[in-house]
């Protein structure tokens, strides 16, 4: 991306030239140049108007009484503003490079009453009055957080269920297409469909739902690798104050959250601070050059994690990692710009307060300016002390992962992020499971040793139980394919996920054995949930629509998830693990309410496990109940472990 100032143009003329535009026809370039040359003349004659104010509203009684309004419209920055509303004070009015923007700093007293605040702007004989709403806070649940007591279900709303076909297509959007036969196009899933499936999730044992972003992505189709693709994934925001109308819009999202809460489920919102879509409304009339990270020529991030934490790293390597664009159509936001920072932070608070969401997942966490992230996290936690924040930092080692969360390491920068996505444990779980039933399972550092070693490094985190654990997601190969479509490994992996420390999260369709590799593209791991669309030939939301093998998997997940939900020891209990021996891996979860023993045989042969070695945790217990089979064990002297099986025992005295 290049920012250019055309000869003879006003210094306020901002022209975004994205990589695709560099190859536009000569005639189009001429028309563009002429329009830019005429802009200063048009600006002098235009009528001043205000077309947007963000945040669109605010609330009385927030812990932070201050809010900064972004006001946009032709000439909006040339007005002198006043506010005459009891309890609302205009502290400062700021202008920036582009005269179409003003930034108004307001302080809202706790005594202010809800109502319509008039933002009055004057310039010469012209006076404008823009209404802006101040609301009363309600007492509906919000910011409840997710904890180790929860089981999160991650789904892509476009691929989960379609409850309202009337919102599948809109002619006024840049991408008016919907075609389920094309894996790269939108498929029509929406919030109405998701709401209809809440009983399904409740029955499965899920306690929280995380959707990939639902905010507006009014992006055109983009050419990626020679194929035209839609922004169905949601990571290219074009307006942070509107839920995409193909999902149902703001009203549908608010209704969905309320219905989820009524069903006893929490809602996680997927946030993106690092970038926006290149057709975001602000980018069509940029406030200032420094709103984005700008380069002389298009510069993409290296996607390398090491320069951020490397004490020996060159500054240019750090800058490319952090300030390079993620892809050409997702411009990189400059969070060191205070106006950008305020805009993003206030939108985060607005979403929690307006929609009532409970937790905050942050996309591409490691690519953000980390002091900004600390400021944003602190602002959310100040308003909602119980809210949980967990970011995506796709790293390969524990030290780098700890850098982005509250940790015990003497880093020069200290993160205040409460949680994070545990990519290190995901890698360890998959590595261990792939070697189940092979000679490597009994090796020095093979099989369950991968898992043991990952958990053995938990000392670097202030609280590892706040990390979100998972086996796959929308960017990775599906779990079942990673483990060779092996149901024994599948059950062992889910057993580990739902009984070890952390906040377990499962990707949609795992419970019905959906599988695929990201080959040739990630669309293969984002297929529609069968039965989510009217007229689907199969309905996997029902037992009758599933195969016997799929029902076996579903019932297994349900039993394990229900046990996890109902037993505090798996939420708050301590973890003690024993070094794996001969492919046998044992750990305990324990607290004052009970003790659970998980014994895994990762070899391809049945094994007898003497338990004397585990006396530190098992002493005093004489019998047990097998959580997964219901079988009662009258003695704990030895355990019989079938091949490729994890046994979950509730110890009894």
Range-by-range predicted roles:
Residues 275, 349, 353-462, 485-487, ...:
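Active-site-proximal helices and loops of the catalytic beta/alpha 8
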Residues 62-125:
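Immunoglobulin-like IPT/TIG beta-sandwich domains and homologous Ig-like subdomains
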Residues 32-41:
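Sec-dependent N-terminal signal peptides
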Residues 464-485:
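Active-site clefts of carbohydrate-active enzymes
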Residues 160-354, 373-383, 388, 393, ...:
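Substrate-binding/active-site clefts of carbohydrate-active enzymes
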Residues 46-78, 133-138, 143:
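Beta-strand/beta-sandwich contexts
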Residues 128, 137-151, 202, 512-653:
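Carbohydrate-interacting/catalytic domains
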Residues 7-10:
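Short, low-complexity intrinsically disordered segments enriched in A/P/G/S/L with frequent Arg
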